[in-house]
Amino acid sequence: MKRAEKREHLIDVATRLFNRLGYHAAGIDQVIAEAGLAKTTLYRHFKSKEDLIVAVLRRLDEKYRDAMRQTVDKLAQEPHAKLLATFDFLENWFKNDAFYGCPFMSAAGEYGERPNPILQEAVVHKRLMIAYFEELARAANLQEPHRIAEEINLLHEGATAVAHVTGDADTAR
């Protein structure tokens, strides 16, 4: 495996473990054991567990936002319909076997006591989501697009939390 492939493999394995077990509960030893790599390899790519978590969150942010955009663009053409299609995306995500709630809220919950790079990544993701919802609200010519974007974000957050706790994907409807 090439150097870049090892880094990506570590991020993939860490993503699965952190989502399933939690950021604190999943240890570095578990990550390297499941990845089948040496601890020195991990530390060649990441200075600390926190750096690995930041890399995981960045990857998740990129994948999540790309997947939502693709789904929304595929399902809807009209601006108003695109706003509603964001909830169809959520429903599909909730039905995925790898759905364990919002990884950004989990990270913020586990590392949010003080300002740090992990909390910062969670905040960046939430702000980027609000910006996307605002973009959709502006395209739909809605009044107060930022306020509407924040409200849509709250609906998404609530639906995600309820789906995680209850296992009911219909909370996105």
Predicted segments with their positions:
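N-terminal intrinsically disordered/low-complexity leader segments
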Residues: 1-5
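Generic hydrophobic, amphipathic alpha-helix propensity
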Residues: 6-15, 31, 56-60, 64, ...
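Helix-turn-helix
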Residues: 9, 16-51, 55
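Hydrophobic alpha-helical connector segments
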Residues: 55, 69-96, 139, 149-152
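Amphipathic alpha-helical packing segments from all-alpha helical-bundle domains
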Residues: 62-65, 81, 114-139, 150
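Amphipathic alpha-helical segments used for helix-helix packing
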Residues: 96-116, 120
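Hydrophobic/aromatic-rich alpha-helical bundle segments in the mid-to-C-terminal region
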Residues: 118-124, 139-173
